[in-house]
Amino acid sequence: MIAALFAVDNIGSMGWKGSLPWPHNKDDMKWFKTITQDQIVVMGKKTWDSPDMPSPLPGRFNVLFTNKFIDRDDVEQIKGDVCEALKSLKQNNKRKNIFIIGGLNLLLQSKPVLDRIYVTRIQGEYLNDTQINLPEFLDGMRLHQTVNLGSCSVEEYHNDTVSRSIKTNTRKRKEQD
């Protein structure tokens, strides 16, 4: 599975001065850790450099999507076409889920290959310099479930088109063999 995983407030705020716009949210962070533990997390350079982000994230395979090489052995660095890179990463790691965790540009570029989108809803409206048009980003996705975490909630969306496409391509390959 290739999934986007991010949090927004009531107006789509995602970032403020390289950080999250709202105060630390224990419920969201606990859920984030649970779902990404032992999986692959993919992020852009600004997310990697965020003061809110321990880099690398412990207990996960960290992938940095950047054109600017950093001298680190604890992260895989990739560049080029986002969708092709994500498909290749999935092909080489079939037993792992891939979570794109930010920033906004990486999320937007990855949309064509997303199987799922997980949106944490943080209540309130916060100052931001990074904002997503959530209705536009979720276009073509189907709400599967909403989970209440206490101080926030998580909405899980499925992309039936991508899932069907993957299954169809698998069937075609089997028929050709």
Language-model features: locations:
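Enzymes that bind and transform nitrogen-containing heteroaromatic metabolites
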Residues: M1-D177
